């Protein structure tokens, strides 16, 4: 198995600081939020998986922002549906 190097991921993002932010956000999605990895896990930790995804061009700041906006929209839609159900006297 080839080792992931930070330089490979930096080339995809543009600079080390943004790469660190993107990798941390993606690793948190995988570890805490239960998002599925876009690459084979191979017993790697979430940070290594995130770096591999960045290296392959599967993840960047824009894709993370879009995913986050979609998650917020889904959460808001569920909340609106719950409030509507309560207002109509239905239970979920």
Curated annotation (Swiss-Prot):
Disulfide bonds: none annotated. It catalyses: RNA(n) + a ribonucleoside 5'-triphosphate = RNA(n+1) + diphosphate. It is an enzyme of class 2 (transferase). Coiled coil: none annotated. It holds the Pfam family RNA_pol_Rpb6. GO terms for cellular component: DNA-directed RNA polymerase complex. One of its GO terms (molecular function) is DNA binding. SMART domains: RNA_pol_Rpb6. It comes from the Bacteria. Its EC number is 2.7.7.6. Keywords: DNA-directed RNA polymerase, Nucleotidyltransferase, Transcription, Transferase. One of its GO terms (biological process) is DNA-templated transcription. Belongs to the RNA polymerase subunit omega family. The RNAP catalytic core consists of 2 alpha, 1 beta, 1 beta' and 1 omega subunit. When a sigma factor is associated with the core the holoenzyme is formed, which can initiate transcription. Promotes RNA polymerase assembly. Latches the N- and C-terminal regions of the beta' subunit thereby facilitating its interaction with the beta and alpha subunits. HAMAP family: RNApol_bact_RpoZ. This is DNA-directed RNA polymerase subunit omega. It comes from Shewanella baltica (strain OS155 / ATCC BAA-1091).
């Amino acid at each position: 198995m080839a080792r992931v190097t930070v330089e490979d991921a930096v080339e995809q993002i543009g600079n080390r600081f943004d790469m660190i932010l993107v990798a941390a956000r993606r690793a948190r999605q995988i570890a805490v939020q239960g998002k599925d990895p876009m690459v084979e896990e191979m017993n790697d930790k979430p940070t290594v998986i995130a770096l591999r995804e960045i290296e392959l061009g599967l993840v960047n700041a824009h894709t993370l922002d879009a995913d986050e906006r979609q998650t917020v929209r889904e959460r808001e839609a569920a909340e609106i549906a719950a409030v509507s159900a309560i207002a109509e006297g239905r239970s979920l």
